[in-house]
Amino acid sequence: PLYSSAASDVYKRQAVYLVGLSVWSMGVGNKVRVGVFQGNGGAQTCIWETIASIQLDPDMMVRTITTGDIANGALRDLDAIIIPGGEGATQYMNLGEENMERIRNFIRSGKGAVGICAGAYLFTDTPGYACMHINGGKAIDIEHDNRGHGISAFSLTAEGKKLFPELAKRDKSYVMYYEGPVLVKSDNIPLPYTTMAIMETDVHEEGNAPANMTNNRPFFIANEYGKGRVFSSISHPEATPGMMWMIPRMVRWTLRMPVVAYSKRVVNPDLYNREILMTKDDLRKERGYYRTFLYGSPNEKIAALDWLQACRSWDAKRWVQGLLFDNSPAVRERAARFIAETDYLPFLSDLEAACRVERDEQTKQSMMRHFEHLKALLPHK
């Protein structure tokens, strides 16, 4: 034969990959094509959660893109790009100046861009910070960026109520905030933005951050950029059960798409109706539960999951995956409930696998209910 069987397999895989790219570039049923940047500086959980949020919209399809993909022309096959949370300057370094100019040209041509937390920071015009200068804002008090995190309150402006009518009658709504930038208008670039929401929570739990810095500041801002649009969120709706749908709605705004209703299973702002900020004592307790999951008894693990879910722990979502396969059926069931009740779609396939291999029939039935509850977030095909 001309090629060895191993080489033949490689060529087959390459052919499948190229066919997949071809299908993606054409779109599926004219779906909007969204790329989530996956590079050094982007937090892995933020990438997972951003992908999951886009999957809630029946008119969108999503993939990850790397800095090499951008250089190779991947933006030609996208309608919108999302820069997720993590560390904005590190994402800047990973992208490189030429790729950032490719992204700017992509937006100028009429496409959309959404920046989440670090992504919003990257979009600013902040002196002394590596950024792209595309959203008309600048960050202040950057020496206290590690100011804290937790479920935080915001209020919508008149324009924000048009984009998020599901929240229009609420005085306040709540999503996860994690050390996002404190924004004011840039002094240097004439790029006006519209404030869609105002932060109502004063976060200064860590890093000797001053009080009254985050409250009454822009929470969501949106602007025109050439023929395209940019939306910047200093918070993490994608990491907030019941509020993940806000991310595809932001994408819709950047592409001038109509507002469409999502199901009641997806839109659930009543899950959080108060601030839940992590204090230093809370953070110490949270860190201790890492060891509990390694060495604790079943009852200790379940108690830890109860507390971590109640306070909407940021770190716990990275720890629960393996608990689906704990030696204790009670722990396995509680881990499944944690994942389902926190709408953690990134672990849907793990939960499905756990259900399939579960040996205890009562536990299996309960876990299957949690699986179906989580799966119900996805639009019907």
Could you describe each region identified by the protein language model?
Residues 1-14:
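Single conserved hydrophobic/aromatic residue that forms the stacking wall/gate
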Residues 32, 104, 131, 217, ...:
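Extracellular ligand-binding/catalytic regions of CAZymes and related secreted enzymes
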Residues 89-168:
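A glycine-rich, often tryptophan-bearing local segment used as a flexible ligand/cofactor-contacting loop or short
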Residues 152-226, 234-241:
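Catalytic beta-strand/loop cores that center a nucleophilic Ser/Cys/Thr
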Residues 283-292, 313-325, 344-356, 378-381:
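Amphipathic alpha-helical scaffolding segments comprising HEAT/armadillo-like alpha-solenoid repeats
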Residues 296-297, 327-328, 359-360:
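Short inter-helical turns and helix N-cap capping residues of alpha-solenoid HEAT/ARM repeat scaffolds
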